[in-house]
């Protein structure tokens, strides 16, 4: 039997992530915002500060951060119905992932009795929307915290880790970093790796798609993912110093 034709990458090798760019301060109504591009995938992230504590955080010494995720109807090749079901399984799973990832980066004690909402909306989807949302959410939080510091509303920088994310997968027997949509469709295993820019692991999500893989293959995916997050953050972090919107 002839093996299936694997997607060919244009302009990058198997271990090179797609170019990442970000613009801060793109929403004049939000106290923190960012528009992030990762290849053809685009995410708009905004931060809102609510003066109400999350129910489970009442009386605690720190605030809470929660995330929401949504895809525009024409973010994909074919129009999909606008999301109205708050119990959508995939959406709920991604929102929990985003919340955990972004909370790991923040000292929330300055936000006692308050709740931070990070909204991530997919404008264009070409694979990796959840990892791009982690990056966009982190950029929007950076924008938010920078504005609070500059306005005197905060005295100490509350972001304790620069957190990023990347997808890694096995396409045939080849390990590839930052899968686009065509690669994601045929991957026999893929992981979403969330880590800090110093190489500390935050979360791993994913597994085998087309049958079991070996422990060695999983370990290689994980190690490559953590290293690739550091590569992406080296490209992204300097851009966070520039406010290009408001």
Curated annotation (Swiss-Prot):
Biological role stated in the UniProt entry: Phosphorolytic 3'-5' exoribonuclease that plays an important role in tRNA 3'-end maturation. Removes nucleotide residues following the 3'-CCA terminus of tRNAs; can also add nucleotides to the ends of RNA molecules by using nucleoside diphosphates as substrates, but this may not be physiologically important. Probably plays a role in initiation of 16S rRNA degradation (leading to ribosome degradation) during starvation.
GO biological process, one term: tRNA processing
Catalytic activity field: tRNA(n+1) + phosphate = tRNA(n) + a ribonucleoside 5'-diphosphate
Keywords, sorted A to Z: Nucleotidyltransferase, RNA-binding, rRNA processing, Transferase, tRNA processing, tRNA-binding
Family: Belongs to the RNase PH family.
Species lineage: Bacteria, Thermotogati, Deinococcota, Deinococci, Deinococcales
Binding-site list for phosphate: 90, 128-130
Stated name of the protein: Ribonuclease PH
Pfam family name, one: RNase_PH_C
Subunit structure: Homohexameric ring arranged as a trimer of dimers.
Region named Disordered: 1-33
EC number: 2.7.7.56
CDD domains: RNase_PH_bact (cd11362)
HAMAP family tied to this protein: RNase_PH
A single GO molecular function term of this UniProt record: RNA binding
Keyword match Amino-acid biosynthesis: no
């Amino acid at each position: 039997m002839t093996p299936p034709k694997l997607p060919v990458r244009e302009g990058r090798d198997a271990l090179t992530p797609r170019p990442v760019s970000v613009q801060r301060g793109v929403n004049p109504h939000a106290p923190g915002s960012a528009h992030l591009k990762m290849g053809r995938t685009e995410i708009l992230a905004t931060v809102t500060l609510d003066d109400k504590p999350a129910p489970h955080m009442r009386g605690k010494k720190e605030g809470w951060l929660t995330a929401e995720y949504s895809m525009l109807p024409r973010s994909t090749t074919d129009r999909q119905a606008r999301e109205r079901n708050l119990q959508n399984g995939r959406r709920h799973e991604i929102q929990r992932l985003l919340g955990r990832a972004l909370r790991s980066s923040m000292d929330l004690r300055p936000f006692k009795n308050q709740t931070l909402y990070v909204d991530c909306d997919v404008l264009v989807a070409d694979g990796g929307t959840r990892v791009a949302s982690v990056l966009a959410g982190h950029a929007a939080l950076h924008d938010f915290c920078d504005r609070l510091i500059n306005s005197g509303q905060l005295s100490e920088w509350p972001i304790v880790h620069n957190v990023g994310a990347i997808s890694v997968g096995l396409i045939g027997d080849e390990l590839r970093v930052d899968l686009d949509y065509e690669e994601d469709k045929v991957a026999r295993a893929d992981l979403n790796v969330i880590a800090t820019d110093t190489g500390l692991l935050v979360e791993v999500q994913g597994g085998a798609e087309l049958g079991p893989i070996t422990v060695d293959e999983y370990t290689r995916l994980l190690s490559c993912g953590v290293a690739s997050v550091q590569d992406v953050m080296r490209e992204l972090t300097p851009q966070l110093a520039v406010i290009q919107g408001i």
